[in-house]
């Protein structure tokens, strides 16, 4: 019997069994994996095929035949059409547990951790209206909106429920008036309501100011200037909790030197500076460093270094007591990992928005130098499948060396046969008997004296001076 082929527009019934990597629910139809937006594992649905690939298909729920207990009514009128959110139809409590499972799965699958120590996800203080940045596509009519990830169709958006009012206000004013450009970015401080609109708009119908080079925002009472090309956390309220997790993990002291790699506009450097002796903040973006110089200007214990992290770390002359890594989604350059292992800070807090690249980098760090103590996921992006993580690593204690203070051929052969690595350190103890000393007592005394003499040269290790003296 010839296998049936799916076609775009076809409606199919299927049972959903698991979550996909991008937040869809997955089922099978005639041995073809189908990734279904708007579904929940455990449900039976009717879905319409929107794209067909060689090995899988994408579909969208049009009818729920058997609903999950976790299904809720999405509040957004654009939900399911715009694709910016994936999980508005999923109870928020379930969103958090699924994100924990996804992080653990990625660390196991990519990082090769058997039972990764992933803690429960810390919820966001607000589940809607948290974003301070939006990038809109604009159609020929000047309408602002988003492009559906699967169908590639443009969807006009008059109000986004993930954005706070500092975004939605300008969106309403600009809607239908921006045909002069194809992309438009709006950024706005959640507390300051300071706004940046890029690019510059010349339509005389638009009264809203545009073309600003930067805007101001604040986190936990600290003001930050953010230039148009610079990265800044999109969920300011949850960022406060991220910093709290980092502080708890690193347990820094007022005398510590803290490395803040990929510092951006200096967010973590500014928020951690009061708790350490010095922060070395590294960033490759010249625009972000210019922002960071203003943001850290009155904080004397922050040293800013412009350059790629993988180029700066090998040349650091000061060894950090702790380190924060907050790389882009692609993760750390291999040379960054190598240099960090050489610098050997006792504790590292690795902040990541991609669990798979996090797993890859943690695997490299933990191969020989570090132990993964815990991973704290934080919900920086409610209603989506994305999740932020803070991983805590502690430096492994160096293996205690085996030192031979007396290396007979038999002793060498025995240790080598056991696969043990050792070094021979001869002592200067003269092998002379004391008056009236029996040979057995002489051997015992010399072994102890040799062991004590050699042990005085080392801070730690196992010193062997006889077959029975360690």
Language-model features, listed with the residues they occupy:
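Accessory RNA-recognition modules of RNA-modification enzymes
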Residues: 1-325, 330-338, 344
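Residue-level signal for inorganic ion chemistry
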Residues: 27, 42, 85, 354, ...
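Conserved beta-strand elements of the Class I
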Residues: 257-259, 349, 403
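The conserved SAM/SAH-binding core of class I Rossmann-like methyltransferase domains
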Residues: 282, 351, 425
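Short alpha-helix immediately C-terminal to the canonical SAM-binding loop
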Residues: 289-290, 358, 412
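S-adenosylmethionine
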Residues: 305-387, 394
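N-terminal polybasic phosphate/anion-binding patch
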Residues: 397-462
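Conserved beta-loop-beta/alpha segment of the NTase-like Rossmann-fold superfamily
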Residues: 460-470
């Amino acid at each position: 019997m010839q296998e049936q082929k799916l076609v775009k527009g076809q409606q199919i019934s299927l049972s959903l069994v698991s979550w996909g990597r991008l937040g869809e629910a997955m089922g099978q139809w005639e041995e073809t994996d189908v990734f279904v937006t708007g579904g929940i594992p455990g449900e039976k649905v009717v879905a319409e095929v929107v794209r067909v690939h060689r090995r899988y298909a994408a579909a969208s729920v049009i009818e729920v035949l058997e609903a999950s207990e976790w299904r809720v009514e999405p509040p957004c009128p654009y939900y399911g059409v715009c694709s910016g959110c994936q999980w508005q139809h999923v109870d928020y409590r379930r969103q958090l547990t699924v994100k924990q499972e996804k992080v653990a799965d990625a660390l196991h699958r990519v990082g090769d951790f058997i039972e990764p120590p992933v803690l429960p996800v810390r919820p966001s203080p607000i589940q809607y209206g948290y974003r301070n940045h939006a990038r809109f596509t604009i159609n020929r009519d000047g309408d602002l909106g988003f492009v559906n990830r699967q169908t590639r169709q443009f969807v006009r958006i008059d109000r986004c429920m993930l954005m706070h009012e500092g975004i939605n206000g300008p969106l309403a004013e600009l809607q239908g008036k921006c045909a002069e450009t194809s992309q438009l970015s709006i950024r706005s401080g959640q507390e300051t309501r300071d706004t940046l609109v890029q690019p510059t708009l010349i339509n005389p119908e638009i009264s809203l100011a545009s073309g600003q080079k930067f805007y101001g925002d604040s986190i936990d009472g600290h003001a930050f200037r953010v230039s148009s090309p610079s990265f800044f956390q999109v969920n300011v309220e949850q960022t406060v909790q991220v910093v709290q997790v980092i502080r708890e993990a690193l347990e820094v002291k007022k005398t510590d030197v803290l490395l803040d790699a990929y510092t951006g506009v200096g967010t973590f450097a500014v928020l951690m500076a009061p708790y350490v002796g010095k922060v070395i903040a590294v960033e490759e973006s010249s625009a972000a460093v210019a922002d960071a110089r203003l943001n850290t200007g009155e904080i004397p214990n922050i040293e800013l270094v412009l350059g790629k992290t993988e180029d700066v770390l090998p040349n650091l002359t000061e060894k950090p007591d702790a380190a924060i890594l907050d790389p882009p989604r692609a993760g750390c350059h291999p040379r960054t990992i190598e240099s960090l292992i050489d610098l050997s800070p006792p504790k590292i807090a690795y902040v990541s928005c991609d669990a798979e690249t996090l797993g890859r980098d943690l695997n490299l760090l933990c191969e020989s130098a570090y132990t993964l103590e815990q991973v704290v996921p934080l919900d920086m992006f409610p209603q989506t499948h994305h999740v932020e993580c803070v991983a805590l690593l502690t430096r492994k204690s160096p293996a205690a060396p085996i030192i031979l203070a007396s290396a007979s051929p038999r002793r060498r052969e025995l240790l080598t046969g056991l696969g043990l690595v050792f070094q021979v350190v001869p002592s200067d103890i003269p092998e002379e008997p004391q008056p009236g000393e029996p040979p057995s007592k002489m051997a015992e005394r010399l072994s102890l004296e040799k062991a004590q003499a050699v042990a005085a040269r080392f801070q730690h290790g196992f010193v062997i001076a006889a077959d029975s003296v360690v």
